[in-house]
Amino acid sequence: MSEQDKNVKLSDNERMKRESNFLRGTIATDLKDEITGGFTADNFQLIRFHGMYQQDDRDIRGERAKQKLEPLHNVMLRARMPGGIIKPEQWLAIDKFAEEKTSYGSIRLTTRQTFQFHGVLKPNIKGMHQLLDSVGIDSIATAGDVNRNVLCTTNPVESELHQEAYEWAAKISEHLLPKTKAYAEIWLNGEKAETTEEPILGSNYLPRKFKTTVTIPPNNEVDVHANDLNFVAIAENGKLIGFNVLVGGGLAMTHGDTATYPRKADDFGFIPLEHTLKIAEHVVSVQRDWGNRSNRKNAKTKYTLDRVGVDVFKAEVEKRAGVEFASSRPYKFTHRGDRIGWVEGIDGKHHLTLFIQSGRILDYPDKPLKTGCRKIAEVHQGDMRMTANQNLIIAGVAANQKAVIEEIARNHGLIDDKDTEQRKNSMACVALPTCPLAMAEAERYLPSLVEKIEALLAKHGVPNDSIIMRVVGCPNGCGRAMLAEAGLVGKGPGKYNVYLGGNLEGTRIPKLYLENVGEDVYLAAFDELIGQWVNERNDGECFGDFVIRKGIVAEVKVSVTDFHA
């Protein structure tokens, strides 16, 4: 804990972490309590460090209350999968568990490039962790005040460069993991081992969540500006030579609190490969010591940078690491969408990217997606890759297997030629009924909204054009609406704030356009705006660039001064 924390009142989460015996708490005791389906007191928060959130089915919460029953408590688990790579045999294991042991029967791909189980009841939690462990998966530090799942560009076309970037993502993930043995002790019946220190994270762990990426330009699939720490790959002659380091991005905010805001990351400069882990460690250590531990709403790295100054933070990282940042090397992001369909890699292998709306893999009446993915995993000899856009890549397909994979995919609705560009460029967080923070619908509303936006595009004569659109149930940032050309952020049932002005590359924060409005209001606004865009845009000008150029919303250049102005 830093000197500054000794003279301020710390948030209760700091007490909880300090008293947790390195994330053990009394979780093991709670597991045996059959009176409640949930976790009590501090354990409600501590299970997050083990990759779980306690939730309940909000659709039936009221009915259960009438019957004098507690909410239908369950947990959501988020796996740790650096770079999103999963083997077919691992996929088959998670498919079976989702089918047999979860309330919803689905696998949910997320913007954190991993999968989630939703609706796991208390008696099944320990078995879930043991199953995952048996196939080489865990959920350590995918939630809580730690470094979360490390993202990496899923770029199987440039196989050698991607492999190097992925290996760095995995190394960073391992280096920044909590060292406590609490996870193995509680869930895997591991031998108890006393923990006396956390050399990187500290005994109180981090002030708030911390997110890291490794990305290969020109693809910004991982949305670097949504993350605390980013390593942007710099290559020469196809070989990775180092990274530009971007620090201080983040999208979460609180409605009505102007001291909170989304923020882009700052470019600290270039480092050669050999300094990667050292820089990762000391960006984390500076945030550990300097981050706000009294107000969790202002605890993330982005606020630390704005409070102490970017140059001061950067200099402290250099001092601790014994490394000076060189001038940033040139790079450019040009897009961030996934290349849906087949592509051939430089190694001659083929890769099929499957569009999965909102990442929800389930057997629908007309699209048995889950069965299709299972059948692919049963025959596929390469690997599978989850993308930060909630899609799934069947990677490393030999030429003689292409037809087999494609037939399975088409027969199960995993390839649908009717999917429009607008549908592919729209995304939603989970929201209702499972997320306790959701103020409005997101995933369940997205298909309907997309159809209405598609109709407006067709009305104005551009059915093949699209707008990067994201819908989220609350302002916490999971669906990355604050980097969309058009972002809808839930404010209440059926009501959203509408933000406009992001760009295709994901390098601009949008600005509030409409506040707390219903569908009739924002669809009328989109009707007018799309008409203007079609009639008045420059050649190739995207929707987000258009609304900035025309002054429909002001450009957010410096978030702390511009976002709420």
From Swiss-Prot:
- One Pfam match, given by its short name, reads NIR_SIR
Cellular component terms per the entry's GO annotation: sulfite reductase complex (NADPH)
InterPro entries (UniProt xref):
CysI (IPR011786), NiRdtase/SiRdtase_haem-b_fer (IPR005117), Nit/Sulf_reduc_fer-like_dom_sf (IPR036136), NO2/SO3_Rdtase_4Fe4S_dom (IPR006067), NO2/SO3_Rdtase_4Fe4S_prot (IPR045169), NO2/SO3_Rdtase_4Fe4S_sf (IPR045854), NO2/SO3_Rdtase_FeS/sirohaem_BS (IPR006066)
Q: Which domain of life is it from?
A: Bacteria
Which Gene3D superfamilies does the entry mention? Sulfite Reductase Hemoprotein, domain 1
Cell division keyword on record: no
Annotated [4Fe-4S] cluster binding sites: C429, C435, C474, C478
E.C. no: 1.8.1.2
Q: Does the keyword Translocase apply?
A: no
A GO molecular-function term, please? Answer: NADP binding
Keywords on this record? 4Fe-4S, Amino-acid biosynthesis, Cysteine biosynthesis, Heme, Iron, Iron-sulfur, Metal-binding, NADP, Oxidoreductase
What is the stated purpose of this protein?
Answer: Component of the sulfite reductase complex that catalyzes the 6-electron reduction of sulfite to sulfide. This is one of several activities required for the biosynthesis of L-cysteine from sulfate.
Family recorded in the similarity comment: Belongs to the nitrite and sulfite reductase 4Fe-4S domain family.
- Mind telling me what this protein is named? Sulfite reductase [NADPH] hemoprotein beta-component
The species is Pseudoalteromonas translucida (strain TAC 125)
Q: What is the lineage of its organism?
A: Bacteria, Pseudomonadati, Pseudomonadota, Gammaproteobacteria, Alteromonadales
